[in-house]
Amino acid sequence: MKVNSKTLQSVKEDLLNIEQTLNKLIKVNNPILSAAAKHLLIVESKKIRPAIVLLVAKAIDKNKKIKTSQQRLAEVTEIIHTATLLHDDVVDESIIRRGTKSVNKTFGNKIAVFAGDFLFAQSSWYLANINNLEVVKAISKVITDLAEGELQQNLTQFNTYYSIIKYLEKSFNKTASLIAASCKSCCLLSDFDQSLNSKFYNYGKNLGLAFQIIDDILDITSSSTALGKMTTSDLKLGNLTAPVLFALTKNSKLFKIIEREFCEKSDISEAINIIKETNAIEESFDLAYEHIEAAINSIKDLPTSSEKDSLIEIAYDLLNRYK
């Protein structure tokens, strides 16, 4: 998830602190496991998920203060996200992540799985030490959602009767749940109006759904270099995303290509051409835009602040990834 660096200006120093802290938090005696666990954490990235948590913390505090527990929540969010990437790359046999070799490509599948498990365990430890039961419940549910989402995806590969509703349910579990719960948990850790919980939960939920839809568009339309990971990987695996599902309603030939599981050499390129020739990409973008609008509307009544503006800008930056 990429955003304009100016959008994160108000939490720039806080993010630098988090990057330094993350390296210290991941403690393990085995050097191979340590290197594998830190492989993606230390790769330069926007760290947008922890940035969102920090922006929420400042947006709801008139003194613009970030509590220690909120910073730790931001760190836990990034650790969980990284753990999911390690496991996803093993399942999807990915070789590139964040513009570098994936952990499974560098260290092998077993080490990648162990490293992902280790990061989940570390996140649970640090989460428990935040010492807030409601936050523990919210983030623990995320880990359940992540597993369920991955299973939903793998059990529906090449299923041409898969619906947009089911796709959004899966996308919530795999992507949006973590952002939604982190935003809500940041409010739970504040000393301010708890009625904001649902507003920020809905912001995170819709932002996460929009991100996944845009990411799925780019999997069809972008390059591996621009995206920082292999493109058309979901399509090849039979993971039917929004552009594919919309295209299926307009071209019966795509049904046949998918149902034979791309067994012919030209099937992938032909499927991509069909998707691009329909207005499936545009329909997918419109769906993402609906969720962006819903995210922004969730927080539009907040008091004016640079942090609120940044949260809104992050939403629009997602759309600019496609444009």
Curated annotation (Swiss-Prot):
* Cofactor field: Mg(2+)
Keyword check for Lipid biosynthesis, yes or no: no
User: Where does this protein hold isopentenyl diphosphate?
Assistant: K46, R49, H81, R98
Q: Bound how, and how many: what does the cofactor note say?
A: Binds 2 Mg(2+) ions per subunit.
Localization: Plastid, Chloroplast
- Where, if anywhere, are coiled coils annotated? none
Binding of an all-trans-polyprenyl diphosphate occurs at: R97, K174, T175, Q212
Q: Name one GO cellular component term.
A: chloroplast
GO molecular function per UniProt: metal ion binding; prenyltransferase activity
Residues the record lists as binding Mg(2+) 1: D88, D92
PROSITE patterns per UniProt: POLYPRENYL_SYNTHASE_1, POLYPRENYL_SYNTHASE_2
EC? Answer: 2.5.1.-
Question: Which residues are listed for Mg(2+) 2 binding in this entry?
Answer: D88, D92
UniProt xrefs under InterPro entries: Isoprenoid_synthase_dom_sf, Polyprenyl_synt, Polyprenyl_synt_CS
Classification via SUPFAM superfamilies? Terpenoid synthases (SSF48576)
Q: Which cysteines are disulphide-bonded? A: none
Give the record's GO biological process terms.
Answer: isoprenoid biosynthetic process; photosynthesis; quinone biosynthetic process
Q: Which UniProt keywords apply?
A: Chloroplast, Isoprene biosynthesis, Magnesium, Metal-binding, Photosynthesis, Plastid, Transferase
What the record says about family reads:
Belongs to the FPP/GGPP synthase family.
Q: What does this protein do?
A: Possible role in synthesis of the nonaprenyl side chain of plastoquinone or in synthesis of other prenyl chains such as undekaprenyl pyrophosphate.
Concerning NCBIfam families, the annotation shows: prenyl_cyano
| Designated name of the protein | Prenyl transferase
Q: Which organism is it from?
A: Cyanidium caldarium
